[in-house]
């Protein structure tokens, strides 16, 4: 039976990459499955019943692709520990410093107008992004509801409640009960882009669907919305840092 050590010898990975590679046997698997994730690393899932030579041949053919995936995971994990953070929506930026803690997982982030000090627990690579996301959520709670309220008053469009959420695919939403949800990662977008999303949800207070009437209402509220929409579609693919997404 093929083991993790067997494939490690075949791939000849460096010590840093070995930690990102694993092999698992599954009763449900009928073929070799390759999984790549910043959280779990690169995983090879093998059927419990398999021919060793068949596995070795397939893995050998994919050696360069596997190495490429592992390299991407390694680089993505490095982005979990940024040296600086900018919130374009508000125009503020901070230099980020780290302080080691080994006995337990600390939860306090120290902030000055120009610096963030993040307690780092080295045994958990995801501890830093967890703290940074908590900090980002607090900044979003401070800014986005007030900004939405100001725009709401300006346009005479009134909502019921606003919630700041962690959302992977939606930047915002508006319900039939006039409740608005906003993605905290809007703080990482330029002001015109985050304002576009807020105007988009305010327009839904008039027209819930995306019919032509909705876009006409949005253009009334924000005449240049098309430029910001194009920018949003471009930036959302690569602008949000890994620490805010994981």
Segments predicted by a language model, with ranges:
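Walker B beta-strand of ABC/ABC-like P-loop ATPase nucleotide-binding domains
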Residues: 198
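Active-site-proximal or metal-binding-adjacent scaffold patches in catalytic folds
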Residues: 1-195, 205-246
